[in-house]
A protein has these predicted regions:
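Membrane-water interface at transmembrane helix exits
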Residues: 46-50, 70, 74-83, 126, ...
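Hydrophobic, lipid-facing residues on alpha-helical transmembrane segments of integral membrane proteins
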Residues: 61-73, 77, 81, 165-173, ...
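Hydrophobic transmembrane alpha-helices of multi-pass, membrane-embedded glycosylation machinery
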Residues: 44-50, 143, 165
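N-terminal transmembrane-helix/juxtamembrane module of multi-pass inner/ER membrane proteins
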Residues: 1-40, 74-102, 221
């Protein structure tokens, strides 16, 4: 009974988020949900890691491991095992979900790979950077990235929560493994990464989001 109530609440929350749509946000969140626009930010973060750490290769390999674990657990194991239909494929929600540009995603949605991968990256790099501003920026990005999936109607809130759990677990496992295999790759000081490099990451990330918002404003404003 409680489980069914939770599922119904999950549907109601999804419809509330997805239902608050506008032409501006349709394009905005469609672009936010994509991966290409985040390449500059990812490259800058990798550049800062390589520039700062002598054992950068180990750190990068651990990042790849964290994301790979999150992706495989969510997509290859959990989705087919749980087999929960995405909102866009759920017969009981037919005609209720706002679909953007015909995008409906794959058949199953629990857990969200976007949420798993983004939070794996966010948590692992936060543990490496050990900087509060960076943590706010990167987790803000992960939340925005994950929210876009609900706005587009391809994931329920519980899909996102499950993805966050898988992603954070993967990041912790990768971090502990790195700490055991190559302890010197783990920064011991909060000042290992220069503040100017954190600001550089912030500028690139905010320009990416701001550029999309500004472009949409001129299109729909």
């Amino acid at each position: 009974m409680i489980f069914q109530q939770l599922i119904e609440l999950d549907k109601d929350l999804l419809l509330a988020i997805n239902g608050a749509n506008t032409p501006f946000f349709d394009i905005f969140f469609m672009m936010i949900s994509g991966k290409l626009m985040w390449i500059p930010t990812a490259l800058i973060i990798l550049y800062v890691i390589i520039k700062t750490q002598h054992n950068a290769l180990w750190v990068i390999l651990a990042i790849v491991l964290a994301i790979t674990m999150a992706d495989q657990l969510s997509s290859t194991l959990i989705k087919p095992l749980v087999a929960r239909l995405r909102p866009t494929h759920e017969p009981s929600l037919a005609g209720l979900v706002h679909v953007v540009n015909g995008y409906v995603g794959g058949k199953y949605g629990f857990v969200s790979s976007h949420a798993a991968n983004s939070f794996a990256f966010a948590l692992f790099t936060t543990l490496i950077f050990r900087n509060r501003l960076y943590a706010v920026l990167i987790f803000g990005w992960a939340c925005l990235f994950s929210y876009s999936r609900m706005y587009l109607g391809v994931h329920y809130p519980l899909d996102i929560v499950g993805g966050i759990f898988v992603g954070c677990l993967s990041a912790i496992v990768a971090y502990l493994l790195l700490k055991k295999l190559k302890p010197s790759a783990i920064p011991t000081s909060k000042n290992t990464y220069a503040l100017r490099d954190i600001y550089l990451i912030a500028v690139v990330l905010l320009l990416s989001v701001g550029g999309v918002a500004l472009g949409n404003y001129f299109c729909f404003g």
